[in-house]
């Protein structure tokens, strides 16, 4: 980590981090017991939070060095504040109390740099609070590590906040039941006084925050389980008995260990103000210096499946990168002096564009490998770098030939015998070129090396936790370049401000000393402009605008004096339009709406410049954002509107300044006024002839106002066009801070384009002493880098504008210089030898001819290449046409065959229909015949049954009569008993039996004949059913053929036949 604070160490095997309970991470207060608790959470008394003074808030406040109090929570009444303390190990200054931010619904977020606004947290009144407890005011730029590509899975209440089993169980439940995952960015502070923040990845706004001292336990999912890419932490809520667990999932699984390590670091470290001393710490007997040689190598995809080292420019000492090509970062770490220290692992490889970047601006790269080299002398770390990521857009755009970019690479190493991780920071220069550019210049070595001096202090035996713990702690870490810079800064030749003295002239900015060797120019669009203004000034401007609106054609008298002090930011949009005379610009507004619909011939140049316009301003830095879209429309509309000039490089800066104060239509109108009415477009005409006249006027003014600087520029052959071109063409809008740019535009719109001379002379006059000490290269570098940085202080910019306004440069004098220039040009033309002129013209024409020939060759080559490509495409198209023709013929033949098959199937279908009709009619007739036969037999049977019943009844009646007659006869009565049975005479009985048997036999014969006829009828019915089955079989075969022909109507007909046949068959049964 960096030098500002120290960090703790976490074991590789550790899956969880707890502020009070972990074998790898036990935090002990200096006031507490020196023997840390090592239980695993089974004993509540040992793992509970210990509060000084037995829980008394007053006693706790007296013990605390810094107190964090909860702000009032109006939206969550009834929840109480929980103030407990962690017990910090060794380095902590004491226990810390904390606040919990209220968040009922958390919207998770991925990781970008967090810039924390300066704020003061009010003290929440409570019982026992005393006046001695002051609120904690966080630092404006909180030192933190930001992690992106995280997903928030949710939170839940837990009863055992330090139980790893409970935490893993809740992690599994939330991961499996999560239906709506939310992307978040997590910011983890580097000190225990900090706050963990959840940020929105799009707007970078804070969603929720959790103070470190409220976080009780951290845990990650076990390897080999679905939760291996998840981690969680528990925090105490407002009620002392309420604990919540928050679960997150990482898109990059390796980042889980890095996040847990950041939490462990925050638990260990106290926010001590330990800036790096300007002088090295004195050598003590118990300290040692270890020297490390760290080399950086960048590799690019060579298109053949391998990565090759990128070249390094021998003169500029910068890497040359190709745009949009995948890269790898390779770091070689080798210890060169002192006792060898064992590097355990690398837990972070980070990269960021720029120089002197903050920790929160560094972006984590994916680690591919780490370990000892083949010879065992160095430790090698390799990481993959995707340059197309939005974070690295600055180092993925083509760099102008005269510029270089800075890039910062950091590697975090865990050294076995060192208590804290060590961060080696490498700042290198890079240039980005086209992906198709060939590398043709000679190169030196393809890596850059920096020596680092790590000063360690051995920890005393009694301060260690055990015998196997770390042996050293970091005192300071310094690179060789920092040492050289410090020596240069402290040398007597460098002018340092005397203590206690304050100069009235514009002082050198305080950052000049530390950025003297910084070759990176100030980004355009930098500098915050405040809209605050004194009430008296606003009242004065309000009265002036009221009078002005009464007559817009006449400017108020006091306008010039007010503009010289600067127009209030809130009024600039309106005042600029009035100064430019755009109060009647309806025709330009309508014209603009038409122009943006037309095509511009300079579209590519506009698009290229827009990406470079105000990259430091939030409104324009997003590619494809609203700011760049509006800026593109304005530049495109003007290029179509002014066909003679079109779009010229630098116009986008002026358009961006206007766009920051007014809508697109009004900004376009003011831009047109500045270009035409103020004469800015004249500078671009006639091969920049008027611009060269301005350069001559500036040099003549320098000769009059700053003669010594003018003579110095003559001595070093520095001409005005070498440093002032951008001043005139962009009106100082390209490089200087915005508050200074806006003030210059105020003066320009009020007094005209001659204001440029006032500002230019002011810049030269205030920088005269520095410029007199420079040579040609140094002067150019000063104008490009140091000069804009001098005015990052708004006070310096105001003094410069006061100086510029006080300079009296009359128009008469400028006219005089203009005449001198034209006279000089005429004299040069007259005095010039015609032969020399013709030779120069001849050389120019030859160069133009060579250029045209080269262009012709290029076009011819492109034409040949295009013809070859077109011939190849034509051959491919012809082959494809032949194949399609063959396929068409085959398809046509298949269609003819299919039509013939269709006709054949239709004929067969008609025959089947006819056969089905015949068989159906025959079956119906058979069924009717069988039905009539069955009905006749049923009728006969019923008649016979009736006849039998009648005969039986008659027989019974006759028998009864005979019985009565016998009863009446005295002789016959003896032959019968009381039941009517014959007593004795067997012959009579036999006769009667014979008569009865004959009658029965007759009936049986008749019944047998009827049964035989019935059996014959059933046999005929069975034969009819067999025939029906045969018909159904034939119908089934026909059905298959019909189905093949996809005749669905035939299926319905056949089904109706089956249904009818089946119903009638059941009736016959």
From Swiss-Prot:
Official protein name in the record: Rab GTPase-activating protein 1
A Gene Ontology biological process term: regulation of GTPase activity
Domain PID: residue ranges: 142-298
Biased composition range(s): Low complexity: 7-22
Native organism: Homo sapiens
Site positions (Glutamine finger): 649
Highest taxon in the source lineage: Eukaryota
Modified residues (Phosphoserine): 42, 360
Gene3D superfamilies xref list: Pleckstrin-homology domain (PH domain)/Phosphotyrosine-binding domain (PTB), putative rabgap domain of human tbc1 domain family member 14 like domains, Ypt/Rab-GAP domain of gyp1p, domain 1, Ypt/Rab-GAP domain of gyp1p, domain 3
Coarse class of the protein's main subcellular location: cytoplasm
Cell compartments where the protein resides: Cytoplasm, Cytosol; Cytoplasm, Cytoskeleton, Microtubule organizing center, Centrosome
InterPro entries: Kinesin-like, PH-like_dom_sf, PTB/PI_dom, Rab-GAP-TBC_dom, Rab-GAP_TBC_sf, Rab_GAP_TBC_domain
Start and end residues of each stretch annotated as Disordered: 1-79, 482-527
């Amino acid at each position: 980590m960096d030098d500002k604070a120290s960090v703790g160490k976490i074991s590789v095997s550790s899956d969880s981090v707890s502020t009070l309970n972990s074998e790898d991470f036990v935090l002990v207060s200096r006031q507490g017991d020196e023997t840390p608790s090592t239980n695993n959470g089974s004993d509540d008394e040992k793992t509970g939070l210990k509060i000084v003074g037995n829980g008394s808030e007053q006693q706790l406040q007296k013990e605390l060095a810094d107190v964090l109090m909860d702000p009032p929570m109006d939206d969550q009444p009834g929840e109480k504040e929980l103030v407990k303390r962690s017990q910090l190990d060794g380095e902590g200054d004491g226990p810390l109390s904390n606040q919990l931010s209220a968040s009922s619904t958390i919207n998770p977020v991925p990781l970008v740099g967090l810039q924390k606004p300066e704020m003061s947290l009010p003290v929440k009144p409570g019982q026992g609070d005393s006046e001695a407890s002051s609120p904690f005011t966080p630092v404006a730029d909180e030192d933190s590590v930001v992690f992106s590509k995280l997903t928030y899975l949710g939170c839940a209440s837990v009863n055992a906040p330090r139980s790893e089993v409970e935490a893993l169980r809740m992690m599994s439940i939330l991961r499996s039941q999560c239906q709506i995952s939310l992307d978040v960015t997590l910011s983890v502070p580097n000190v225990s006084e900090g706050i963990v923040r959840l940020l929105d990845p799009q707007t970078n706004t804070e969603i929720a925050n959790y103070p470190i001292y409220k976080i009780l336990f951290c845990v990650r999912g076990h390897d080999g389980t679905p939760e291996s890419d998840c981690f969680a932490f528990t925090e105490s809520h407002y009620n002392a008995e309420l604990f919540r667990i928050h679960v997150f999932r990482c898109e990059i699984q390796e980042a889980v260990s890095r996040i847990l390590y950041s939490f462990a670091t925050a638990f260990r470290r106290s926010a001590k103000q330990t800036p790096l001393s300007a002088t090295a710490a004195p050598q003590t007997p118990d300290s040692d210096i270890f020297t490390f040689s760290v080399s950086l190598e960048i590799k690019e995809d060579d298109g053949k499946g391998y990565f090759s080292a990128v070249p390094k420019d021998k003169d500029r000492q910068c890497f040359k990168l190709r745009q949009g090509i995948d890269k790898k970062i390779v770091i070689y770490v080798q210890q060169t002096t002192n006792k060898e220290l064992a590097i355990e692992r690398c837990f972070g490889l980070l990269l960021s564009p720029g120089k002197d970047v903050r920790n929160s601006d560094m972006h984590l790269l994916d680690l591919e490998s780490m370990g000892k080299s083949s010879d065992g002398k160095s430790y090698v770390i390799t990481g993959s770098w995707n340059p197309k990521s939005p974070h690295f857009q600055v180092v993925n755009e083509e760099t102008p030939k005269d510029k270089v970019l800075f890039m910062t690479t950091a590697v975090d190493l865990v050294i076995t015998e060192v208590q804290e991780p060590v961060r080696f920071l490498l700042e290198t220069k890079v240039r980005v070129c086209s992906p198709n550019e060939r590398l043709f210049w000679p190169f030196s070595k393809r890596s850059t090396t920096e020596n680092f001096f790590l000063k360690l202090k051995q920890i005393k035996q009694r301060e260690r936790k055990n015998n196997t713990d770390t042996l050293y702690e970091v005192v300071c870490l310094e690179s060789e370049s920092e040492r050289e810079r410090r020596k240069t800064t402290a040398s007597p030749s460098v002018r340092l401000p005397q203590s206690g003295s304050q100069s009235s002239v514009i002082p050198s900015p305080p950052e000049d000393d530390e950025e003297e060797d910084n070759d990176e120019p100030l980004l355009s669009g930098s500098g915050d402009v405040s809209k605050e203004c004194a009430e008296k000034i606003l009242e004065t401007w309000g009265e002036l605008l009221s009078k002005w609106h009464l007559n817009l054609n006449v400017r108020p008298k006091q306008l010039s004096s007010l503009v010289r002090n600067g127009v209030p930011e809130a009024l600039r949009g309106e005042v600029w339009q009035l100064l430019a005379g755009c109060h009647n610009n309806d025709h330009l507004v309508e014209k603009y709406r038409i122009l943006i619909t037309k095509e511009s011939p300079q579209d590519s140049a506009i698009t290229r410049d827009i990406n470079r316009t105000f990259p430091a301003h939030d409104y324009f830095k997003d590619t494809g954002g609203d700011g760049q879209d509006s800026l593109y429309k304005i530049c495109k509309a003007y290029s179509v509107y002014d066909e003679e000039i079109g779009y010229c490089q630098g116009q986008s800066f002026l358009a961006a300044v206007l766009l920051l104060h007014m809508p697109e239509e009004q900004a376009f109108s003011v831009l047109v006024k500045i270009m035409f009415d103020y004469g800015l477009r004249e500078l671009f005409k006639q091969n920049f002839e008027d611009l060269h006249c301005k350069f001559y006027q500036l040099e003549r003014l320098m000769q009059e106002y700053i003669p010594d600087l003018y003579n110095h520029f003559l001595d070093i052959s520095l001409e005005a066009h070498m440093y002032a071109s951008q001043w005139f063409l962009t009106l100082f809008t390209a490089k200087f801070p915005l508050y200074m740019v806006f003030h210059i535009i105020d003066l320009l719109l009020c007094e005209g384009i001659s204001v440029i001379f006032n500002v230019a002379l002011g810049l030269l006059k205030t920088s005269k002493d520095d410029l007199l000490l420079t040579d040609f290269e140094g002067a150019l570098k000063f104008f490009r880098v140091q000069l804009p940085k001098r005015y990052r202080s708004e006070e310096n910019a105001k003094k410069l504008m006061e100086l510029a306004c006080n300079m009296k440069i009359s128009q008469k004098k400028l006219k005089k210089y203009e005449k001198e220039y034209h006279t000089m040009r005429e004299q040069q033309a007259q005095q010039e030898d015609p032969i020399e002129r013709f030779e120069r013209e001849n050389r120019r024409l030859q160069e133009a001819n060579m250029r045209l020939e080269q262009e012709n060759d290029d076009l011819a080559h492109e034409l040949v290449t295009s013809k070859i490509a077109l011939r190849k495409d034509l051959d491919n198209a012809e082959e494809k046409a032949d194949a399609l023709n063959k396929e068409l013929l085959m398809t046509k033949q298949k269609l003819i065959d299919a039509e013939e098959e269709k006709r054949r199937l239709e004929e067969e279908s008609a025959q089947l229909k006819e056969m089905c009709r015949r068989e159906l009619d025959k079956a119906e007739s058979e069924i009717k015949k069988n039905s009539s036969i069955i009905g006749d037999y049923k009728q006969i049977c019923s008649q016979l049954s009736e006849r039998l019943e009648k005969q039986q009844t008659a027989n019974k009646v006759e028998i009864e009569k005979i019985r009565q007659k016998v009863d009446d006869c005295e002789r016959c009565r003896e032959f019968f008993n009381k039941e009517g049975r014959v007593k004795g005479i067997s012959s009579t009985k036999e006769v009667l039996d014979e008569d009865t048997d004959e009658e029965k036999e007759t009936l049986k014969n008749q019944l047998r004949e009827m049964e035989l006829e019935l059996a014959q009828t059933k046999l005929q019915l069975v034969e009819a059913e067999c025939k029906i089955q045969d018909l159904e079989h034939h119908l089934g075969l026909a059905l298959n053929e019909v189905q093949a022909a996809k005749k669905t109507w035939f299926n319905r007909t056949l089904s109706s036949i089956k249904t009818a046949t089946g119903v009638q068959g059941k009736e016959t049964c």
